[in-house]
Amino acid sequence: MDSQSPSAGARPITHTTTPPARKLPDIHLDIVLVVFCGGAIGTAIRYAFAQIPAAGSFHTGTFVANMLACFCYAGLTAYLAGASRFGARSKELASRGLGMGVCGGLSTMSTLALEGFTAIRDGQVAAGIAYLLVTFALGLVCASAGVWAGTHLAGSSNVSAEASADTNAATTSKGGKA
């Protein structure tokens, strides 16, 4: 056998490539500030809801806070996606400040998990599981309702903005002032 043949123990040539370096995300201080301020507001509202007394294993304050956050965040997202009268920067600030900040500070997955786990640990297994399931199911319902509301609000604001533009254009074309 030829000593140069691959079967004679010669190693095949391999090409190694180094993966491209990961680029760190750009941190914008104005976005950090609106998230921080929104989070403070959402957390304060969450604290107010926490003062609502629980009904057995059903923690009303946590439930209301989470449902409101689901509805508002989904509604805000749908509204901003459909509203054409705002620029990209305004939409980003609103999404980060109101959505991530206020709604993020308002909602509380960790407290929900703790309350459900505590009920189960304390022997209220059915009540704890029911609380968790009802919260998740109604959270989806609230988010769906929020998407519907946000979509319709965006559609009606776009229609009114277009009607206003049409009225201004008609007035201008007739020699009036816009």
Curated annotation (Swiss-Prot):
Chain sites annotated for binding Na(+): G104, S107
One Pfam short name: CRCB
Its membrane topology: Multi-pass membrane protein
Record-annotated membrane-spanning stretches: 25-45, 63-83, 97-117, 129-149
GO MF, one example: fluoride channel activity
GO biological process: cellular detoxification of fluoride
Catalytic activity reported: fluoride(in) = fluoride(out)
UniProt keyword list: Cell membrane, Ion channel, Ion transport, Membrane, Metal-binding, Sodium, Transmembrane, Transmembrane helix, Transport
Activity regulation as described: Na(+) is not transported, but it plays an essential structural role and its presence is essential for fluoride channel function.
InterPro entries (UniProt xref): FluC
GO cellular component: plasma membrane
Keyword Chloroplast: no
Compartment(s) of residence: Cell membrane
HAMAP family: FluC
Function, as annotated: Fluoride-specific ion channel. Important for reducing fluoride concentration in the cell, thus reducing its toxicity.
Family per similarity comment: Belongs to the fluoride channel Fluc/FEX (TC 1.A.43) family.
Official protein name in the record: Fluoride-specific ion channel FluC 2
Lineage per the UniProt record: Bacteria, Bacillati, Actinomycetota, Actinomycetes, Bifidobacteriales
